[in-house]
Amino acid sequence: MNYLIVPGLNNSGPKHWQSFWEKSLPNATRVIQHCWDHPEKADWVETLVKCIQQLNADTILVAHSLGVCTTVNYLLKAKSQGGVPPYIKGAFLVSPSDVDNVELIGNFAPMPLENLPIPACVVASENDPFLSMERSEFFANAWGVKLFNA
């Protein structure tokens, strides 16, 4: 199994859990965006598309924060254009950014609210200062996936 790490705003530093997973998991790679601090939805989604097109083996998408919004936008775009590649087996969506309520990432709004075309889960926590559990539950329900409280 391969793992494609999809970081959020400002990437994930060396002590971030995504960086740890990238180093610890066999066959893990990271999406590298062109501009981490001034994200543009179309650019971020297109970069993810290009990374996915380079894959050729079963892969789990591991997204965090704005990377979740990028991943959800990609999945629904792919769904509407013939489907997600069969080697994309699932998505691990951690602490989605609330793009509808944060000015810096507002060009990602609105958050897509459709069932995802692949197995996925949302992982959130009650002490997340950026996203309430209620909002996390709202996203998970809209995407048709299970929510885990970490």
Locations of the language-model features?
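Gly/Ala-rich beta-loop-alpha elbow adjacent to hydrolase catalytic centers
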Residues: L61-V72
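Conserved alpha/beta-hydrolase "acid-adjacent" motif
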Residues: P14, N101-L104, P129-R135
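Conserved loop-alpha-helix segment in the C-terminal half of the alpha/beta-hydrolase fold
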Residues: E22, E126-K146
